[in-house]
Amino acid sequence: KAEQWAKSFVNNLAKRPQGNDRAQVKAIYEGECDIALINNYYFGKLKFSEDPEQRKWVENVKLIFPNQGENDRGAHVNISGGGIAKYSKNKENALALLEFLTSEKAQKLYGEINFEYPVNPKVLPSLELQKWGEFREDNLPIIKIAELGPLSQKIIDRVGW
């Protein structure tokens, strides 16, 4: 089923994706395609860019979250992880850094400056993120994504993605 989906996806590409997230938004703006996949925080970076050309791109596209139907799984959410090496010589400071990064103060900054959603449940998304609307996130465990990685890569290779 996944391979058929991937094959259909590839067959519907207006063009082979090239460049970064910004390039995908520009491609929509220039009429090269009607839809693209990007990390949402680039939408905010473009919207508030110092480059008026980039602001123009984002003013002419709409951000949507996929898989939001009643029986859909929700949108995939990227995560950033942190850890402490087993033999770290500075575990206390490493732990203090991780605790700060997940603190209310740091999580608010991530949202306001980098347009990222908070991982700390005590922190609301920034006002800009709230303007984009609510969405249901996919709750597939990250370990399952990791387990399916090698098979996913084989499928991608077979369908010429």
Regions flagged by a language model, labelled:
Residues 77-90, 109-110:
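A bilobed periplasmic-binding-protein/Venus flytrap-type ligand-binding module shared by bacterial periplasmic
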Residues 1-66:
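Ligand-binding pocket segment of bilobal, Venus flytrap-like solute-binding proteins
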Residues 100, 104-161:
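Extracellular/periplasmic juxtamembrane helices and adjacent flexible linkers that interface
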Residues 12, 27, 31, 46-49, ...:
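Structured segments of extracytoplasmic/periplasmic soluble domains
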Residues 58-82:
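A contiguous binding-surface segment within folded domains or other stable secondary-structure elements
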Residues 1, 88-94:
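Short helix-loop capping/hinge motifs at secondary-structure junctions, enriched
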Residues 7, 22, 26, 30, ...:
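Solvent-exposed, polar/charged alpha-helical surfaces in well-ordered, non-transmembrane soluble domains
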Residues 41-44, 68-72, 89, 103-107:
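Solvent-exposed loop/turn segments at secondary-structure junctions
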